[in-house]
């Protein structure tokens, strides 16, 4: 059970934890309030180590993703403090698929997404993803002859209804391979990695993209799952134009790189 911020503030005042509502901000910064507490934040504040004027240990070296991919995460959440060490994909002589950009997109026009209960889905988007993989999967497998097939492609989407929709289309289009392609929400891929990650945005151009912009950490995880290529499948017009937002920065990074 989660305590709402308004109740959390009231309890802190009546319990004498804070004397004024202005002091509540201090609890939020230190991670001590019950509505949005963070054990990690409290631990970091107690740590004797400090880097980039932040308390706690910060692992600044990054080797998983090509630099073009991790640059998005670096700008989004790390304030430019990450040190990309893998190098640029376009400069790598061992790059598997040279004609593809490290960050790219496939435009799929849609005004609105569909609703299923409290979730969302976009059937056309799911169909296009399955169709693209049907046409490209053998090519991808041949480009990575020493890699296990299950480690090649992952598909991330913000909505569980879209997960089911994509899985159904994969079963229909590539029945012999669909179960070797991971499909799930960001949480499914926590700690995982794939050579290629596809993001199914789901939103239509008139929907906005609330879920994508709601939590920068989720987009950080989604993008950084991709070792070699990160592709956005959806209507790019649903993404914002402001670079300070997660979707706006993503739009900037993939713009002009249509696959």
Regions found by a protein language model. Give the residues of each.
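Conserved helicase motor core of SF1/SF2 NTP-dependent helicases
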Residues: 1-259
């Amino acid at each position: 059970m989660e305590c709402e911020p308004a109740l959390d503030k009231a309890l802190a005042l009546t319990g004498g934890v804070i004397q004024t509502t202005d002091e509540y901000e201090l609890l939020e910064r230190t991670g001590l309030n019950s509505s949005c507490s963070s054990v990690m934040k409290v631990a970091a504040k107690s740590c004797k180590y400090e880097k980039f004027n932040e308390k706690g240990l910060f692992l600044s070296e990054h080797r998983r993703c090509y630099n073009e991919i991790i640059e998005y995460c670096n700008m989004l959440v790390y304030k430019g403090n990450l040190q990309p060490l893998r190098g640029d994909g376009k400069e790598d002589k061992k790059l598997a698929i040279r004609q593809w950009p490290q960050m790219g997109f496939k435009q799929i026009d849609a005004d609105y997404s569909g609703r299923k209960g409290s979730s969302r889905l976009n059937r056309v988007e799911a169909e296009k993803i399955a169709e693209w993989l049907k046409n490209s999967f053998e090519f991808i497998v041949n480009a990575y002859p020493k890699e296990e097939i299950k480690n090649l492609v992952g598909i991330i989407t913000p909505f569980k209804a879209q997960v089911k929709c994509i899985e159904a289309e994969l079963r229909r289009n590539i029945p012999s391979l669909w179960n070797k392609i991971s499909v799930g929400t960001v949480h499914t891929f926590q700690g995982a990695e794939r050579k290629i990650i596809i993001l199914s945005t789901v939103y239509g151009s008139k929907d906005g993209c609330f879920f994508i912009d709601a939590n920068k950490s989720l987009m950080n995880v989604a993008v950084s799952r991709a070792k070699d290529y990160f592709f956005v499948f959806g209507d790019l017009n649903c993404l914002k134009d402001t670079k300070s937002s997660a979707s706006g920065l993503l739009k900037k990074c993939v713009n002009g790189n249509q696959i």
